[in-house]
Every structure is written in structure tokens, then in C-alpha cells.
């Protein structure tokens, strides 16, 4: 319930990825300008292996696992041994869906895998407000006033058992 979340988010630059997740959990979102950017609901992983570099340098680099931990770092070993990215992509897909579901709940919109929002796109402030990804344009003062107004409403409701 929006009245339980008496927190406002104020965007004065870029609110992307995890910041978007956190920011949209507020009761109200304000954005300073059409030049601000929000979105980037996506997930990625960067992979680097230095094994060949170490080998060329004469360094014997080994990862040794006990037989009882055969699934430890399975995804990484699948890339290194077989150039197979699928295990990591499967894990990333699960985490991406968790991210999308959280954004869907925060914004009160249905998850649609075809929607650019859920595919990682960044939006300018005007597009974000028009699509309902941000509540309104405003200043930091507007955000503070909103929080104070919510606290006042809550207090009045408590006083009169509303």
C-alpha cells in the first residue's frame, strides 16, 4: 500500500538497474528533468579467464575440487572446458525474472517479456513518466513535501481511527 511506503525517490541523473529496482520500491518517484534516465532492467555477467595468459607466463594455474563438490563453479568450468555459456545463461535468466517480477510489483504493471522495460532499455525522463515508470516530474523539495504530506495523513488517520 502506497501509504505504508512513505518514502520518495528523487532522480537527478540516472537511476538504472539495481538503483531502478530500489528506487521504484518507494511510495512515489520524482524525476528532475526529461534529460534524466531510468530503466536498465536487465542482468549480465562478465567472464574473463587468465589461464592462457598465466600459462604463457610459465605460471601453473590450477583449480582443484574434491569429488564431493563436483558442481562447484560448474557454470564457469562449462565455459572454460567446453565454451558452453548455457549453464550461466540459465542462472542469469532465473535472476533476471526475479528482477523483472520485483519491478512489475513496484510499478504495478504486468510482466511482459516483450516490453522494452523488461528487456533492459533505458528511458529518458519524459518517456518514463508517460509510460508510468516514474510518477512525476518534480524537485527534491516536491519529494520532501510529498513525504511530509504522507506522514501527516497517516497521523490524522491514526488520531481519528480512519
Q: Where are the predicted features?
A:
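N-terminal organellar transit peptides
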Residues: 1-36, 41-162
Amino acid at each position: 500500500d502506497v501509504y505504508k511506503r512513505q518514502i520518495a525517490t528523487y532522480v537527478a541523473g540516472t537511476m538504472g538497474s539495481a538503483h531502478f529496482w530500489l528506487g521504484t520500491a518507494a511510495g512515489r518517484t520524482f524525476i528532475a528533468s526529461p534529460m534524466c534516465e531510468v530503466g536498465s532492467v536487465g542482468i549480465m555477467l562478465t567472464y574473463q579467464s587468465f589461464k592462457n595468459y598465466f600459462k604463457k607466463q610459465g605460471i601453473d594455474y590450477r583449480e582443484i575440487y574434491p569429488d564431493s563438490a563436483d558442481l562447484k563453479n560448474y557454470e564457469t568450468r562449462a565455459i572454460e572446458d567446453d565454451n558452453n555459456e548455457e549453464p550461466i545463461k540459465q542462472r542469469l535468466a532465473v535472476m533476471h525474472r526475479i528482477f523483472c517480477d520485483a519491478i512489475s510489483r513496484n510499478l504495478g504493471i504486468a510482466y511482459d517479456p516483450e516490453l522494452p522495460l523488461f528487456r533492459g532499455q533505458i528511458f529518458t525522463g519524459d518517456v518514463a513518466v508517460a509510460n508510468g515508470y516514474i510518477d512525476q516530474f518534480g524537485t527534491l523539495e516536491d519529494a520532501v513535501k510529498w513525504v511530509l504530506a504522507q506522514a501527516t495523513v497517516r497521523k490524522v488517520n491514526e488520531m481519528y481511527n480512519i
